């Protein structure tokens, strides 16, 4: 079983007691997909609760369907935007799910909950006596620390020292411990090394929830993110043959699982995995540092279904930083309004893009150009977080590169967006996919204790990946039984 659902009755009973004392109810996957099924009593509490409040009721806001407000919102449709063609420069329509309206301002709170909730409901994590460790390149440890705080668990957040100031400042208010590891976004091995060190020091007193290897992360995005995109496609009335592509950065491998769900429904759909050009691990077995915060690198996540990936897009981190300035600097906004002709609403929507979301958009643009898609075609991507997470980067960029002018805005719009090329975009053959898959060996078998046999199962066993989605229903049964005891 790829997700441990064995029950430890003694620890489970303690977790029930903790949740009963704190009045904590756990949402099911069904409720995260369709929050209209959330009890009225919960909805009443949410109406009086801020989106980021450290209040257990906010567990029920782990959904793509939150009302897009910061205070007291209810539920509605899926939060998404269409990226204007004046920006993409391509014929097909490109849509993006919006992560800003999750608690913590990023969808990673979903993956962390999906890892933590089954462990609580089965007793594989002791909320009373153990610390939850959240290794991350940014948003995952924020989500983990937040969910831990909601559930009254002690937490340890681990992330690279060069991540944005906003991440560290917020974590200090929520996490029990914050550990900065050496390096930047792509220094994932250093995070793993710190986990091994903590495991040796603290042993049974901690549980490490590693997003790069836990299939609960894959399951959440397959089930919740994939369902959200399907719902939007239905609302838009897109013909099946015109659902052409899904683009997401590799990161932990989680968001790519939504593409697997889409491909199960639309078998012709192409999935593009994005990464930084400055660290082209998938494209060239390469390495290096980069500035696209939140997408990791230098390894292939254990939970990445590489055999189902059709394309690799390596994105220049300078393009991402330039476009972030275009969307957020006064000169950029003026140019977009007066020269490009975007409406006030379209310009406001650009604030929904964080740096990794911009990278995802560029992968979708490369994909559209590579496959010569037309006006009837549709692609989907993800805005993991929003611009609010990176405002201090603007001052840093001003200092490094000088003030952003309208001339710079024109250069970025023309170059990084309208003339984004298909260079560093690779359509994968069978053996190129296998080459990428085999890179897992060096991280996961040699360093992290996985087996050669399971690595081969991921590639050759047709039931391996298909066994994961049905586990959502099994976890829901465990959560419902747990909640029943909490409410008894």
Residue spans of the language-model regions?
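PLP-dependent amino-acid enzyme catalytic core
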Residues: 1-488
């Amino acid at each position: 079983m790829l997700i441990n659902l064995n029950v430890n009755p003694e620890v489970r009973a303690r977790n029930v007691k903790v949740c009963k004392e704190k009045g904590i109810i756990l949402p099911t996957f069904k409720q995260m997909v369709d929050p209209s099924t959330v009890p009225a009593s919960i909805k009443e509490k949410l109406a009086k609760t801020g989106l980021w409040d450290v209040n257990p009721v906010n567990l029920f806001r782990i959904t793509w369907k939150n009302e897009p407000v910061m205070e007291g919102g209810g539920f509605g449709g899926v939060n998404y935007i269409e990226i204007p063609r004046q920006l993409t420069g391509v014929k097909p329509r490109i849509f993006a799910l919006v992560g800003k309206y999750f608690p913590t301002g990023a969808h990673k709170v979903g993956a962390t909950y999906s890892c933590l909730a089954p462990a609580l409901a089965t007793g594989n994590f002791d909320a009373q006596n153990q610390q939850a460790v959240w290794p991350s390149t940014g948003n995952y440890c924020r989500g983990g620390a937040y969910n831990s705080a909601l559930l009254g668990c002690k937490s340890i957040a681990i992330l690279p020292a060069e991540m944005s100031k906003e991440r560290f400042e917020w974590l200090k208010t929520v996490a029990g411990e914050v550990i900065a590891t050496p390096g930047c976004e792509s220094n994932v091995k250093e995070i793993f090394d710190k986990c091994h060190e903590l495991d040796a020091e603290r042993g049974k007193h901690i549980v490490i929830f590693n997003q790069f290897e836990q299939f609960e992360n894959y399951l959440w995005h397959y089930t919740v993110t994939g369902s959200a995109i399907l719902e939007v496609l239905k609302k838009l009335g897109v013909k099946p043959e015109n659902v052409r592509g899904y683009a997401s950065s590799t990161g932990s491998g989680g968001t790519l699982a939504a593409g697997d769900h889409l491909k199960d429904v639309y078998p012709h759909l192409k999935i593009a995995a994005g990464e930084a050009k400055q660290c082209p691990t998938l494209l060239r077995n390469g390495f290096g540092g980069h500035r696209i915060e939140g997408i990791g690198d230098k390894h292939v996540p254990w939970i990445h279904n590489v055999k189902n990936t059709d394309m690799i897009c390596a994105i220049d981190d300078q393009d991402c930083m330039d476009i972030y300035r275009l969307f957020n600097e006064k000169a950029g906004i003026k140019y977009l309004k007066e020269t490009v002709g975007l409406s006030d609403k379209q310009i406001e929507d650009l604030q929904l893009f964080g740096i990794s979301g911009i990278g995802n958009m560029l992968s979708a643009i490369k994909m559209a150009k590579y496959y010569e898609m037309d006006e009837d075609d549709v692609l989907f991507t993800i805005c993991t977080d929003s611009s609010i997470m990176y405002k201090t980067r603007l001052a840093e960029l001003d200092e490094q590169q000088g003030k952003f002018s309208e001339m710079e805005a024109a250069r970025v719009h023309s170059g990084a967006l309208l003339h984004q090329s298909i260079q560093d975009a690779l359509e994968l053959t069978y053996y190129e996919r296998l080459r990428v898959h085999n890179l897992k060996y060096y991280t996961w078998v040699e360093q992290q204790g996985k087996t050669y046999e399971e690595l081969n199962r991921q590639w050759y066993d047709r039931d391996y990946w298909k066994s994961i989605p049905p586990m959502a229903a099994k976890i829901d049964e465990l959560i419902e039984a747990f909640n029943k005891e909490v409410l008894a």
